[in-house]
Amino acid sequence: DFDGGGSASASAFYADNDRIQCWDPWVMQSSDRTAYDYPETHNRVMKIMQFALQRAKEQNAHDHEGPRLWGVLVTGVDLWDSVCVNNMRIVDLNLAKDGIDSADWNVKVGHQWDWAIRKTRFHQLTAVCKGLVKQGVRIFWETHLRLTNYSFGKNEEAAKWRPDWEKASNNFVFQIITMNREDTYDDETGKLLKSEYTATFDKCKTNAQLQGQKRTVLVTEVGKPAVFLGLPELYDGSL
């Protein structure tokens, strides 16, 4: 739960469900000028995911009894990407002593920011997630978006809202669902009347019928109770 969204949702909507466990991946510094210990945060993420993978393997044994691991949601995958970038600077290339230290420019140019290292770190999480999928566990990644065409400042024409890390994901992600909010305003007063939250299947390798389809998941209107419709495809097997 990198961005805290998982624990917030669990607290707000599933307070009585003790089967939803939220894990904070961040490791704080005990006495330093930076808040986070990036190397130990990377290690903690790996320990959490490897624990989940071990549980998934154990529950597939014929004599297993008790609760089963249904799925794993990783919130703020873009923040995991930032952990990998900082570790590339601090640990792998020794360009900075912590997450806020400026790198020596000559050294940085010499190494050209070795993005292959960052990519390798990032895909440690990907590898464990793929292992969980093979064990029958559902994996969901939630991420913030950036307006980009992956030229990284060279030419941002025709930019779209995309995950920063998607270009380096090697097509490991089979489905991409983009969430949007569409607002309706009063023509005379300009006040907000209604908000419609939608989910668009921008990518769906496992079900061609869903490709490009859009669903309304939540509707809020001023003075009326919110109407939650959800996204049935997430749990009915059609993905």
Where are the predicted features?
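P-loop NTPase motor core
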Residues: 62-168
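Conserved nucleotide-binding/hydrolysis micro-motifs of P-loop NTPases
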Residues: 3-8, 27-29, 77-80, 145-149, ...
